[in-house]
Amino acid sequence: MSRYTGPSWKQSRRLGLSLTGTGKELARRNYVPGQHGPNNRSKLSEYGLQLAEKQKLRFSYGMGEKQFRNLFVQATKIKEGTLGFNFMLLLERRLDNVVYRLGLATTRRQARQFVNHGHILVDGKRVDIPSFRVEIGQVISVREKSMKVPAILEAVEATLGRPAFVSFDAEKLEGSLTRLPERDEINPEINEALVVEFYNKML
């Protein structure tokens, strides 16, 4: 399954989750798109609930199904901690997500574009792979030639607050992951246990 590239507001309403992080998509119409949207909330089966939760998490990070599933498999190999939370930590450590958390982009989709276009450095070296796994303490910065890109400057200006697990220097346009996040600091609207149940049946 390829990565969804259509309007994020449609996907947000379908999932009942703001994919942009602003909540604007759901402010006026918090039901699925379509002619029968307001009356189209049928009761889901156990499998349907698991699938819906998996889709919410996958679309939140803007990933294709194959890449998402492969990352879950990697999480199953981590000995310590719970599988669901370990999976979410791997998602959080993706470079595109860290760029988003630092406030260098307004959405994860935009962050992925910045990485793909070569605007982002890791410890001074350009990395154009959104799935690159960021280590604690690595310095994420904007390439010197990209420091005046309007979209990046606008994103930094628009960011009102950042998670406690990152640090950021607005003058240098650089920051880092200072520690791994706690469970209550990321995606509180997601029930990762349902995602684990879904993949346990599939794998």
Curated annotation (Swiss-Prot):
One Gene Ontology BP term is: ribosomal small subunit biogenesis
Record GO terms (molecular function): rRNA binding; structural constituent of ribosome
Source domain of life: Bacteria
Per its UniProt record, what SUPFAM superfamilies does this chain match? Alpha-L RNA-binding motif
Q: Which UniProt keywords apply?
A: Ribonucleoprotein, Ribosomal protein, RNA-binding, rRNA-binding
Q: Does this entry carry the keyword Transport? A: no
Keyword RNA-binding listed? The answer is: yes
Pfam families for the chain: Ribosomal_S4 (PF00163), S4 (PF01479)
Summary of the function given for this chain in its UniProt record: One of the primary rRNA binding proteins, it binds directly to 16S rRNA where it nucleates assembly of the body of the 30S subunit. With S5 and S12 plays an important role in translational accuracy.
Would you identify the family this protein belongs to, as annotated? Belongs to the universal ribosomal protein uS4 family.
Name this protein carries in UniProt: Small ribosomal subunit protein uS4
Please state the gene responsible for encoding this protein: rpsD
